[in-house]
């Protein structure tokens, strides 16, 4: 089946492959660490059994039957190591501390002062070297423990991130399926293709913002028209009670003639590029078109407050650039006619 948005499918498949690869690496590393810990645990037990006869065991252990958390296994391994060291220390102590007859005879011949000197040297060696080495060992053990905890925490975070990414990818697949179903149900919909899906999405988002702004403008015009309609309805409802003033008729006729004269003589002759000119006196807006560009001007007390540009054939960034250049050119301009000339000429020369 041919997909309308094959580039989106390719991107999602690429991300899915990367997340799957990272997840497999994390799981393999955890299995390797678990197997290494179980092997060390088994070897420690075998060493204890072979060294000490007090353990009545054949020394066989199947790590696969052990179903314990990795942290507890590590704690047990450390405890077994500590017991092993303590037993070795006791063995060495008993071996050298319990004297034989020959040892007692030799000790009786020792010079007490020499013995005290040797004892002082041993104490000094123990206090200086052994204690220092013990501190270094404890420091290294602490560093190893800290790094192990950090690695475990990082591994857990990576697993959580992979899980969240997998859920997001599943959501992407669902959205793509919904999009395909919608486009299959609406074959007349124009398919937008691009080599860069990120740019296409960004550009569509900008156009949505532009369309939303235009919708707000149209809603404002609708509110104004409704208010005008309500006022006209009130006037027409009382039409029988009103007497038409000849002066009012003359003023209205003059306004209509002046408006037609302005459109036909001034605008069409002096500014032929302007089309579909519309004036909204109540809202103070002036709307017209120049080529593919639609221009809306907000005028208050004879001062131009804002200029908005719309076009479905130009990109959002291009429209914003033209708008900024126009605002810079009319910033200190007070004549409405000159402003129209500047806007018209710049748009015509830019397109």
Curated annotation (Swiss-Prot):
Q: Which SUPFAM superfamilies match?
A: SufE/NifU
Q: Which domain of life is it from?
A: Eukaryota
The UniProt entry's GO biological process terms, in alphabetical order, are: homologous chromosome orientation in meiotic metaphase I; regulation of meiosis I spindle assembly checkpoint
Q: Which InterPro entries does UniProt cross-reference here?
A: Kre28
User: Which keywords describe this protein according to UniProt?
Assistant: Centromere, Chromosome, Coiled coil, Kinetochore, Nucleus
Give one Pfam family.
Answer: Kre28
State the GO CC annotations. kinetochore; Knl1/Spc105 complex; nucleus
Q: Where in the cell is it found?
A: Nucleus; Chromosome, Centromere, Kinetochore
Q: Which chain positions lie within coiled-coil regions?
A: 124-153, 208-234
KW Nucleus (keyword) present: yes
**What's this protein's function?**
Acts as a component of the outer kinetochore KNL1 complex that facilitates microtubule-kinetochore interactions and the spindle assembly checkpoint. Kinetochores, consisting of a centromere-associated inner segment and a microtubule-contacting outer segment, play a crucial role in chromosome segregation by mediating the physical connection between centromeric DNA and spindle microtubules.
Q: How does it assemble?
A: Component of the KNL1/SPC105 complex composed of SPC105 and KRE28. Part of the ten-subunit outer kinetochore KMN network that includes the KNL1, MIS12 and NDC80 complexes.
The family line of this record is:
Belongs to the KRE28 family.
According to UniProt, the name of this protein is Outer kinetochore KNL1 complex subunit KRE28
Q: Which species is this record about?
A: Kluyveromyces lactis (strain ATCC 8585 / CBS 2359 / DSM 70799 / NBRC 1267 / NRRL Y-1140 / WM37) (Yeast)
Taxonomic lineage from the root = Eukaryota, Fungi, Dikarya, Ascomycota, Saccharomycotina
Query: Corresponding gene?
Result: KRE28
């Amino acid at each position: 089946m041919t997909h309308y948005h094959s580039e989106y499918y390719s991107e999602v498949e690429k991300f899915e492959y990367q997340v799957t690869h990272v997840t497999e690496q994390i799981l393999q590393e955890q299995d390797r660490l678990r197997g290494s810990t179980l092997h060390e645990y088994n070897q420690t037990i075998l060493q204890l059994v072979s060294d000490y006869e007090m353990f009545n065991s054949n020394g066989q252990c199947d790590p696969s039957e052990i179903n314990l958390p990795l942290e507890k296994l590590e704690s047990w391994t450390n405890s077994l190591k500590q017991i092993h060291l303590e037993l070795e220390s006791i063995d060495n102590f008993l071996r050298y501390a319990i004297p034989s007859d020959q040892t007692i005879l030799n000790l009786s011949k020792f010079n007490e002062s020499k013995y005290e000197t040797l004892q002082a040297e041993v104490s000094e060696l123990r206090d200086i070297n052994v204690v220092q080495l013990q501190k270094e060992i404890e420091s290294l053990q602490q560093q190893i423990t800290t790094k192990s905890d950090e690695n475990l925490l990082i591994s857990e975070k990576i697993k959580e991130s992979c899980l969240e990414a997998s859920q997001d990818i599943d959501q992407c697949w669902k959205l793509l399926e919904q999009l395909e179903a919608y486009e299959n149900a609406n074959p007349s919909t124009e398919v937008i293709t691009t080599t860069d899906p990120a740019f296409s999405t960004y550009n569509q988002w900008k156009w949505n913002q532009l369309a939303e702004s235009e919708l707000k403008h149209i809603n404002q015009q609708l509110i104004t028209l409704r208010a005008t309609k309500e006022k006209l309805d009130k006037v027409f409802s009382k039409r029988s009670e009103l007497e038409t003033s000849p002066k009012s008729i003359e003023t209205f006729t003059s306004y209509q003639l002046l408006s037609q004269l302005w459109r036909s003589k001034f605008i069409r002759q002096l500014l032929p590029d302007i089309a579909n000119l519309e004036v909204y006196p109540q809202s103070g807006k002036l709307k017209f078109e120049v080529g593919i560009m639609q221009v809306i001007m907000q005028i208050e007390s004879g001062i131009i407050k804002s200029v908005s540009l719309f076009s479905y054939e130009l990109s959002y960034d291009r429209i914003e650039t033209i708008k900024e250049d126009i605002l810079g050119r009319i910033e200190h301009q007070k004549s409405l006619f000159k402003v129209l000339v500047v806007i018209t000429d710049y748009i015509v020369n830019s397109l």
